[in-house]
Structures are given as structure tokens and as C-alpha cells.
Amino acid sequence: MVLVSIVVPIYKVEKYLSRCVQSLLNQTLKDIEIILVDDGSPDKCPEMCEDYLKVDKRIKVVHKENGGLSSARNAGINVATGKYIGFVDSDDSILPTMYEELYNVINKYNCDFAMSDYERIMRDGRENLKSLNIAKGYYDKNRIIKEIYPELIMGRNLDYGPLLSVWHCLYNSNFLRQYNLRFDEE
């Protein structure tokens, strides 16, 4: 069992895929598996995935019929062996320390989930740091209801909608499996 499985759904992203995969290979946390889920992409992505498979033993490839983003993420969950699971969209790149930092938070607080800020890079190259107005730390059920829910619903970044997304989080895989948490494919 590896420490962290990183699921990457792939569809028509050959322009961005190399940058994404390289950012995953550059993680300071080395005990990872990178699961590239080719969601029936009609471009060169399937071949690119096979090439990556030869580059690093931490890479796994799943080829499947196109079923959409949720279906691809679920396919990745199904083959993940990590104690924790993260998701990265294939047109994104992440900082080298992202998963090490998220793991350290989970380990420190013994929690099932950790979330980071992220930086949105616009087409014109402008960068915007996006974060929830939430203090770092452990949140029990009452604190989540009181402090987190209101921020998710009426956060200060309404121009982009709520910032709760899977691609800047790390999850305990046992928690996901225990409650059969999957992405809705409907």
C-alpha cells in the first residue's frame, strides 16, 4: 500500500498533460501512486499515458470508455491503493510540496480530510490566490456547521463560486470507502 494515490481524469488535454504529470512526479512526498484515467480521449492522450507508464513505476494507467469526469474519478478510486486519495485535474499543475503538506496536516490532526488554498492562473497569465476565509486547524462537527458551511455558501469569492472542490484536497481512503462516497455519474 502506498501512502497517497493521486487520481487524474484525462480527456482531450494533450496540451496540458505533460505539465500536469511532471508536477506530480516532482512531489516531495515520494510514496505516491499516480493513476492516469484515460476517459476514452480521442486525441493523443491514451498514447501519452502509455509513455508515462514506462517513465516511472509509480504511474498506473486506466483506459476506459468515455463516461465523463465523475466516471473517470470513480474508476481511479476503484484501483487506488493509497491510504489517502487526492485528485488533480489534467489541465492543472501543483506545487511540489502540495501532497506532503496536506498529509502532514492530516497526520497532525488525525483527520479524514485536508484542504489547501490554490492559485488560479488566468488565460492572460494573471495569477489570483484563492482561499476560503477559514483558519487553519481542526474542526469538529459543531465548528464545521458554525464556521465552514456559511463560508462555503456565502464566501468572499462569489465571482468563482464556492471553493470546495476535490482537486485541492486529500481524503482518507478508508473514510471514502466506509461511507461509499463516490462521484455522481448521472
Q: Which functions belong to the PLM regions below?
A:
Residues M1-E186:
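Nucleotide-sugar donor-binding/catalytic module of glycosyltransferases
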